[in-house]
């Protein structure tokens, strides 16, 4: 049997981290078993579903590289199929028309609550013949009243619900539109879904959906209900904890691999291993190893992973993601070094691509002023001689290579009989405008000869004016 899973978000908002983790687990289970992964947009809530939210979900999935084999399917384009099945169920007697008014239902629930009873439909119309009338009605599924629904959940083990506790679910509203719980069942059947991976908030829907599947003579898939994600304070995850849309993580400078690695470990583990490539995830992932307990979101851990991936991944690949941030910060990269070279130079310290982009600006454009603290410390009168000498040595270089630049700095320090820092630090501030950068020789090499000469001249003038003032 071919394993077939699905991710079925509702387009009422962005793709948040909880949804992304569910999608990842579902995707990994399919990929680990040479199966298929389906993307389905559950947009039956027409009032709350928006094209913008749908586009954001697709963009998030694509950015995470969670590719799908089928879809995206849209429930709103399948209403004819749902209505066909509803008509079939009415004819077979597994569903019925309910003419109870909203007022009657509300009164019934109030009485049940007052008596301490479970609030559920009392079956008033369950065994009545359909009326030849224009009265409004809903269609309800005729849920079994005896026995129980039992299923073995990959995460939670054996789960059982007594049928006597289950309502006769509404499967079509008064205006004729099918309901979420019904559409899900028909979709999973038609699409051949063999395993449903979703959040634990859907556990109570599962017995109802299983009963509908059995009434249709359809196979029942396996289930895996994953725990919710909490904030690091144990409260439900919210925006203040980092419960933002997936694309916000892109905007904040995270690599998709870092976010995926973080999400896969947020409830699943393989020994003590922390860092997983996508291939390792596929190799080791198992639904049965997902933790039952809720997991706490820790932004610091995500940042640590992101820093690791920026440092360890191919600079060309990191540069392909950095391009977006350079454009977002209005840094024109057409006049400067290759972006991959900048990544190699700056990746050791960068925590995010956003940070890396901001710290790379001096490679591509001139700065207006020297950083005050760095200038006060390193662009003093004693810097005038080393800056003047290194400028002449750099100007005399026939080849602008790392080795030649390094030798020029060494020769300057030797001739002046000073330590390398007495040359390197003023030179760094002169060329970058700040006191922090990669190795000075590498920095100069990437900035380029013409820019270096121009900036050193500017620094010499700055020091001279400071001395004379």
Curated annotation (Swiss-Prot):
Monomer. The lineage of its organism: Bacteria, Pseudomonadati, Pseudomonadota, Gammaproteobacteria, Alteromonadales. Catalyzes the attachment of glutamate to tRNA(Glu) in a two-step reaction: glutamate is first activated by ATP to form Glu-AMP and then transferred to the acceptor end of tRNA(Glu). It is found in: Cytoplasm. Zn(2+) binds at residues 98, 100, 125, 127. GO terms for molecular function: ATP binding; glutamate-tRNA ligase activity; tRNA binding; zinc ion binding. It comes from Shewanella halifaxensis (strain HAW-EB4). It is an enzyme of class 6 (ligase). Binds 1 zinc ion per subunit. ATP binds at residue 239. The keyword Translocase does not apply. GO terms for biological process: glutamyl-tRNA aminoacylation. This is Glutamate--tRNA ligase. PROSITE patterns: AA_TRNA_LIGASE_I (PS00178). A motif ('HIGH' region) lies at residues 9-19. Its EC number is 6.1.1.17. Its main location: cytoplasm. GO terms for cellular component: cytosol. Its cofactor is Zn(2+). It holds the Pfam family Anticodon_2. PANTHER family: GLUTAMATE--TRNA LIGASE (PTHR43311), GLUTAMATE--TRNA LIGASE, MITOCHONDRIAL-RELATED (PTHR43311:SF2). A motif ('KMSKS' region) lies at residues 236-240. The keyword Oxidoreductase does not apply. It catalyses: tRNA(Glu) + L-glutamate + ATP = L-glutamyl-tRNA(Glu) + AMP + diphosphate. Keywords: Aminoacyl-tRNA synthetase, ATP-binding, Cytoplasm, Ligase, Metal-binding, Nucleotide-binding, Protein biosynthesis, Zinc. Belongs to the class-I aminoacyl-tRNA synthetase family. Glutamate--tRNA ligase type 1 subfamily.
